[in-house]
Amino acid sequence: MNSIDPRAIIDPSAKLADGVEVGPWSIVGPDVEIGEGTVIGPHVVLKGPTRIGKHNRIFQFSSIGEDTPDLKYKGEPTRLVIGDHNVIREGVTIHRGTVQDRAETTVGDHNLIMAYAHIGHDSVIGNHCILVNNTALAGHVHVGDWAILSGYTLVHQYCHIGAHAFSGMGTAIGKDVPAFVTVFGSPAEARSMNFEGMRRRGFSDEVIHVLRRCYKIVYRQGLTVEDALKELAEPAAQHPEVELFRQSIVSSARGITR
């Protein structure tokens, strides 16, 4: 059974699964679907087309699925898709996509999006990510699984943040961040790898040692990216984690943060 506060406004076309809660003064607009067990707090605005999965919690004053302010957007029917088990804290804004890209903004599963963070149009957030307070992603940004973006991190449009990457507080990212890499500063500079995060997630000492050596190949030996990638070929063939690191460099369109 759903629990809908009588002061909430639910459009007749919205689809709410069993066990959904909607708090007072929240607005669930047309073409919004909310999955089982999701809790919508007070003063939340949900605009469609938006699909929200199961067992999410969205806190007060968040605006989810609003039109993008991108000037090329002309009212086309784009969408937002949010997975399961996400926590979206106070004042978060997430915009739908544009037809010039995939026409979809995507948020995966088990993410923590903290207060006043912004996810721009056409962005793709993986699983188990943390966006700390006031993190702001421009349009078309991709964030890999398990990445952590500390408070006030700013990410330029089209940047890719690799899996398990980490940014320090107030970092301004203008280029791609390879998987596992830790960046700090404005503009961002690579400082190390997220070894503490790896240990917490159960990476073996052997894998951490190999990744440390691979980081030095890319960032400490003065090699060009092309030459560094050649050096990574052998360990990448032996360790999928190194291949993830290597591939995040190979696929970079904006160039990697150095």
Swiss-Prot record:
Pfam families in the cross-refs: Acetyltransf_11, Hexapep
Pathway: Glycolipid biosynthesis; lipid IV(A) biosynthesis; lipid IV(A) from (3R)-3-hydroxytetradecanoyl-[acyl-carrier-protein] and UDP-N-acetyl-alpha-D-glucosamine: step 1/6
UniProt cross-references to InterPro entries, sorted A to Z: Acetyltransf_C, Acetyltransf_C_sf, Hexapep, Hexapep_transf_CS, Lipid_A_LpxA, Trimer_LpxA-like_sf
Keyword entries, A-Z: Acyltransferase, Cytoplasm, Lipid A biosynthesis, Lipid biosynthesis, Lipid metabolism, Repeat, Transferase
SUPFAM superfamilies attached to this UniProt entry: Trimeric LpxA-like enzymes
Catalytic reaction equation(s): a (3R)-hydroxyacyl-[ACP] + UDP-N-acetyl-alpha-D-glucosamine = a UDP-3-O-[(3R)-3-hydroxyacyl]-N-acetyl-alpha-D-glucosamine + holo-[ACP]
UniProt GO BP: lipid A biosynthetic process
The keyword Lipid metabolism belongs to this UniProt entry's keyword annotation: yes
Single annotated GO MF: acyl-[acyl-carrier-protein]-UDP-N-acetylglucosamine O-acyltransferase activity
GO CC field: cytoplasm; membrane
EC numbers: 2.3.1.129
Keyword check for Lipid biosynthesis: yes
EC top class named in words: transferase
Role this protein plays: Involved in the biosynthesis of lipid A, a phosphorylated glycolipid that anchors the lipopolysaccharide to the outer membrane of the cell.
Family, per entry: Belongs to the transferase hexapeptide repeat family. LpxA subfamily.
Protein name: Acyl-[acyl-carrier-protein]--UDP-N-acetylglucosamine O-acyltransferase
Gene: lpxA
